[in-house]
Every structure is written in C-alpha cells, then in structure tokens.
C-alpha cells in the first residue's frame, strides 16, 4: 500500500461538488392544450414550456407544437372503432394558459394497418391531392381490400387489373368531390365517422365487393395565412366539454367586478 496523502480527500472532494442543483421544472409552466370544437372533449392535455425570460417568450416556444391524440380520447368514447384513429393537432396561438390547436393530420395506428393485410385478397390504395374551400391543400390516402362474393366457391378473391384501376378511379373521384366542396371543419366532421370511406365501399360494390375501406392518412401540405378570427371561431362555443376560450379574453381581457375601495394585497416578494 502506498504511503502518502490522498489529494482528493484532503481538499474536500472534486471542485464544484457543493454547487447548488436547481430543478429545471421550477423554471417551467404548464399550459392547457385545447382541441377545436369539432371534437367532444376539448381538453386534450397539458404541455410544459419555459417561462418568459427577456426576449425568450413562452408563447413562441409553444406555437408549432404537434400533439397526436387518439380519436377515442377526443370523443370521450371507448368504442374500438375510434381508438385506432390518431388525429394530429398543431398549436397555432396561445391565450392566457390555453394553447389553441387546429387540425394537422390524421393517421391509423400501425397495429390496425398490419391486422388488415391478409392472404388471398387484393389490396387497393390511392392518394389524392385536394384543396378545401378555405385554402388548405390536403393529401388524402385511401385503402381497401377485396372480399369474396357470397356465392363464390373460390378460396381467393383477387381482382383483375382493370377492376383495380376502376376502383382506384372511383376512390379518387369521391375523395375529390367530398373534399373540394367543403372547408377544413367540414372535412374533419366527415373524417370522424369516416363517411367518405363508407361512400367508396358502397359505390364500388358493382365493380368488385370491398371491405375494410378506410381513409388511411391525411396530410396537410399547405395552409392559408394564419387568421386569428378563424381560429377563435373554431374554439368558440361548440357544445364541447372542457373550458371554452372566450373571444373577449383574447382581445382585451376579462372585466372583473370589484367592491369600492378595493386594494390588492401587498406581496412580500416578487
């Protein structure tokens, strides 16, 4: 054993070991994430952001955040038909402690997509770029599968190439018709029950019977210039649950009645 002093222990350990550890969460604030009034449950959840310090404004750090929420959570529903749809909401503005979101896309869960792909059938897909009446450019993906006819004795149900082309053309026509004649809010209302996919399945029965027809994905490629009035209209009173956003609070604050001679309490520290 070497004889001598241990320099590290004699000086009290490493340099900087007595530095005070500050919890980073003390510098952050919680904000409520609000969904548009197309959904039943307006209170999506909460999100963290650093407090405003100098030129770093908290609201700037929140704008542009994308939240992915299951449709079952947005509709307060435990139905399995809703749980595999995921809606993306993007934060567009901040009012007080509320983060106002707008529709940013839709997708199906991976396990649902994998469970639909099977042998002895034909998978048919299509994608269409369509523009809504209020200027949103969307890319809509549709998926469907062939199914055996009730009188067929075959093991397989493969469609011919000409039938696949005809079904894909029918998908494109119905999606273009339903989206181009609607604004973004109406498109989302059609995506909630998936009425577009049901129309496709019904209209393609004469070409080849289909099942498991879904709008697989919706992407927002381009959006018009940000309009605060339109966003506040989306977050107005729509019968949804949760705290609604008041337009008066957004524009000039809320008027609170105070008794005469009221004085605010003196704070000990700022």
UniProtKB/Swiss-Prot annotation:
InterPro entries listed in its UniProt record: Ribosomal_eS1 (IPR001593), Ribosomal_eS1_CS (IPR018281), Ribosomal_eS1_euk (IPR027500)
Coiled-coil stretches noted in the UniProt entry, renumbered to this chain: none
GO biological process: translation
Region annotation Disordered: where it falls in the sequence: 1-21, 238-270
SMART domains: Ribosomal_S3Ae (SM01397)
Keywords: Cytoplasm, Ribonucleoprotein, Ribosomal protein
One example GO MF annotation: structural constituent of ribosome
Gene Ontology CC annotation, any one: cytosolic small ribosomal subunit
Compartments, record wording: Cytoplasm
Similarity comment: Belongs to the eukaryotic ribosomal protein eS1 family.
Quaternary state and interactors: Component of the small ribosomal subunit. Mature ribosomes consist of a small (40S) and a large (60S) subunit. The 40S subunit contains about 33 different proteins and 1 molecule of RNA (18S). The 60S subunit contains about 49 different proteins and 3 molecules of RNA (28S, 5.8S and 5S).
The protein's name in its UniProt record: Small ribosomal subunit protein eS1
Organism whose genome encodes this protein: Aedes aegypti (Yellowfever mosquito)
Lineage of producing organism: Eukaryota, Metazoa, Ecdysozoa, Arthropoda, Hexapoda
């Amino acid at each position: 054993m070497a004889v001598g002093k241990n320099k590290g222990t004699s000086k009290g350990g490493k340099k900087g070991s007595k530095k005070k550890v500050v919890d980073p969460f003390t510098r952050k604030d919680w904000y409520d994430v609000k969904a548009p009034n197309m959904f039943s449950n307006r209170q999506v959840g909460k999100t963290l952001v650093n407090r405003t310090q100098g030129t770093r404004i908290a609201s700037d750090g929140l704008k542009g955040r994308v939240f992915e929420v299951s449709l079952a959570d947005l509709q307060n529903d435990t139905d399995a038909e809703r749980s595999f749809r995921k809606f993306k909401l993007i934060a567009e503005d901040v009012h007080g402690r509320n983060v106002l979101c707008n529709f940013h896309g839709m997708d199906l869960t991976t396990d649902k997509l994998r469970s639909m792909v099977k042998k002895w059938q034909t998978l048919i897909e299509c994608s269409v770029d369509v523009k809504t009446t209020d200027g949103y450019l969307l890319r809509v993906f549709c998926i469907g599968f062939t199914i055996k006819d009730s009188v067929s004795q075959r093991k397989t149900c493969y469609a011919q190439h000409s039938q696949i082309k005809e079904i894909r053309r029918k998908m494109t026509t119905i999606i273009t018709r339903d989206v181009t004649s609607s604004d973004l809010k109406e498109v989302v209302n059609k995506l909630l029950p998936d009425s577009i996919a049901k129309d496709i399945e019904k209209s393609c029965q004469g070409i080849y019977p289909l099942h498991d027809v879904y709008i697989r994905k919706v992407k927002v490629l381009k959006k018009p210039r940000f309009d605060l009035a339109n966003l506040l209209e989306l977050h107005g009173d729509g019968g949804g649950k949760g705290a609604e956003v008041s337009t008066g609070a957004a524009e000039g604050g809320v008027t609170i009645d105070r008794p005469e001679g009221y004085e605010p309490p003196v704070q000990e520290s700022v």
